[in-house]
């Protein structure tokens, strides 16, 4: 029997591991039947190559093969997969400049040849319809020995010449072993599900990482515990109970980080609590979620300029949510809004910033759909994100410590955006023809500037931070999609136009951009599982950026970028995952700086990929 299997696989020698597995199969009772087969797949994944106008050749290749062996009985199954992948890449970049009798040459070349081989065996045992157990073992090997070349020449600078050459051979040699056990149990006709898993994984490379994960699932809600042993050591745990109408989640995290260079140690402890409830009323349903996270962080460090110091702070984050779905005749509505409240207290007399408070107004989205008829529908969408207009930070200010002004002024840059996005979509569906038109408008306002006020509260001097609006943007988008689905031919066309204007009130900088894209695809079914098709993509994007001097009102600088990309793909495909694809890509970028051409680059790529 072993000779028959060896001749059918057309191999002359098999690893001892596979021979032992086949001997085990021959020893099973006669009632065990093969269900499945020995599968061999792979081939040359593809070759892509091209060259740019700045003499930058690019090469990308992929070769991948896979061997699968499957065995199955009524209550037992075994799958073994051997996979190999080789993916060489080469990128060269050469730039030559000449200005005022000064010659400059920059040459860089990088190549990688990563090889990955993995062997995985999976075992599954199903003693009953509502229970099963599974286990697996995985071995994976990665090797990458690349090359990096760099040459720099800078001549006749102060009557001197500079020449440097660098050669580097990065090496990656990694072994990975993973094993685990899973259990599955369903109760009450599948309404309640309990699933747990235990995973152990070890990686041996330049960095060693080992962790254990325990996962328990109920109604597809998961939790886990992880141990990560490396330069960064951490422990995390989660426990979640999820009946049909209640979601109770407790989680936590402990992080211990040790830095040898500056003898710094950081300890982070962050427990959390989340609660949510769900209810249903006829066809309408809603949910309320409240997330509360408590974070206690302790840090201690020592460097060359100061003695060892330590501090800790407590953070509280509360996020009440409201979600609801409504249906009435031909109208459907969905609401999902939240409100975030954040506060942090820093217990440290050195930094003098005991309290920080931030409130966030409702954040969420709504969607209203009106089905006029089976062929016509209107969809109105709205997204809203409103941050608190004032980020309040109260600090105890000591007049004898004048350095606090400089420390605080350059310490933080926070964003507090306001975002409003509204859209209207019309959809028409006929027998084989469909059309969809959508218009969206987006307004974004960012608050990144800061102002300071000194206030005296209860006999103490406080510094209060105020954040003000500094930039805003408006965008208009129009999309038109057309589709045809016939018995033989399927075609889709999409045209998208976007125009954005972004302005800053602090620097008087304005950026305008126009982006329009064309995507088209057509597929013809030839029968017997074969189909041929073509994909066409074109993108044109122009950006103009300029600043105005506030004092004089004159144009200071202007930059214009013009980007174009064209792609054409021809593909043949079979239902049994046999694919052949040829591609042609062209990419062009032109950059102007006040009428002067600074960069003009063009890349042309031609590639062939096939898979069986």
What are these regions (language model features)?
Residues 90-104, 153-163, 215-236, 281-308, ...:
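Surface-exposed loop/turn segments flanking beta-strands in extracellular/periplasmic regions
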Residues 51-55, 102-109, 163-169, 182-184, ...:
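Extracellular loop and loop/strand-boundary signature of outer-membrane beta-barrel proteins
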């Amino acid at each position: 029997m072993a000779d028959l299997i060896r001749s059918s696989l057309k191999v002359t020698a098999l690893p001892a591991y596979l021979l032992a597995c086949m001997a085990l199969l021959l020893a099973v009772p006669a009632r065990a039947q093969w269900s499945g087969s020995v599968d061999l797949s792979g081939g040359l994944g593809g070759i892509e190559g091209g060259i740019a106008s700045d003499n930058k050749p690019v090469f990308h290749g992929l070769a991948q093969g896979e061997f699968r062996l499957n065995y199955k009985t009524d209550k037992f199954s075994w799958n073994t997969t051997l996979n190999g992948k080789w993916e060489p890449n080469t990128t060269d970049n050469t730039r030559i400049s000449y200005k005022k009798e000064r010659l400059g040459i920059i040459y860089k070349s990088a190549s990688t040849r990563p090889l990955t081989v993995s062997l995985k065996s999976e075992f599954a045992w199903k003693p009953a319809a509502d229970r099963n157990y599974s286990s697996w073992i995985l071995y994976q090997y990665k090797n990458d020995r690349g090359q990096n070349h760099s040459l720099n020449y800078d001549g006749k600078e102060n009557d001197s010449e500079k020449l440097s050459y660098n050669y580097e051979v990065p090496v990656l040699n990694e072994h990975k072993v993973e094993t685990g056990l899973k259990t599955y149990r369903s109760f009450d006709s599948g309404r309640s599900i309990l699933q747990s898993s235990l995973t152990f994984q070890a990686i041996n490379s330049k960095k060693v990482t080992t962790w254990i994960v325990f996962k328990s699932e109920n109604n597809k809600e998961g939790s886990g515990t992880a141990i990560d042993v490396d330069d960064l050591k951490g422990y995390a745990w989660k426990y979640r109970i999820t009946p049909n109408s209640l979601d109770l989640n407790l989680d936590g995290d402990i992080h211990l980080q040790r830095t040898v260079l500056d003898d710094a140690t950081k300890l982070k402890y962050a427990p959390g609590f989340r609660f949510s409830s769900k209810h249903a009323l006829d066809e309408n349903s809603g949910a309320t979620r409240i997330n509360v996270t408590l974070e206690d962080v302790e840090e201690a460090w020592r460097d060359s300029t100061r003695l060892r110091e330590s501090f800790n702070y407590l953070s509280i984050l509360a996020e009440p949510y409201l979600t609801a779905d409504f249906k009435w005749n031909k109208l459907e509505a969905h609401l999902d809004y939240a409100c975030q409240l954040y506060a942090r207290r820093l217990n440290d007399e050195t930094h003098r910033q005991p309290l920080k408070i931030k409130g966030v107004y409702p954040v969420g989205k709504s969607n209203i759909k009106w089905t006029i008829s089976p062929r016509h529908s209107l969809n109105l969408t709205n997204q809203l994100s409103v941050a608190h207009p004032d980020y309040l930070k109260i600090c105890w200010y000591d007049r004898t410590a004048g350095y606090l002004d400089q420390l605080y002024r350059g310490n933080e840059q926070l964003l507090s955006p306001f975002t409003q996005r509204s859209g209207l979509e019309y959809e028409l569906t006929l027998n084989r023809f469909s059309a969809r038109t959508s218009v969206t408008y987006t307004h974004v306002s960012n608050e990144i500037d800061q102002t300071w006020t000194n206030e005296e509260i209860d006999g103490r001097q406080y510094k209060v931070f105020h954040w003000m609006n500094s930039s805003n943007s408006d965008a208009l988008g129009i999309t038109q999609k057309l589709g045809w689905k016939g018995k033989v031919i399927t075609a889709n066309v999409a045209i998208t136009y976007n125009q954005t204007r972004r302005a800053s009130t602090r620097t008087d900088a304005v950026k305008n951009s126009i982006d329009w894209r064309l995507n088209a695809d057509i597929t013809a079914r030839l029968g017997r599982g074969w189909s041929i098709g073509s994909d066409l993509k074109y993108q044109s994007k122009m950006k103009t950026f300029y600043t105005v001097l506030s004092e004089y009102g004159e144009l200071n600088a202007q930059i214009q970028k013009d980007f174009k990309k064209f792609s054409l793909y021809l593909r043949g495909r079979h239902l049994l995952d046999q694919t052949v694809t040829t591609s042609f890509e062209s990419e062009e970028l032109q950059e102007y700086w006040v009428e002067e051409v600074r960069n003009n680059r063009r890349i042309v790529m031609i590639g062939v990929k096939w898979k069986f």
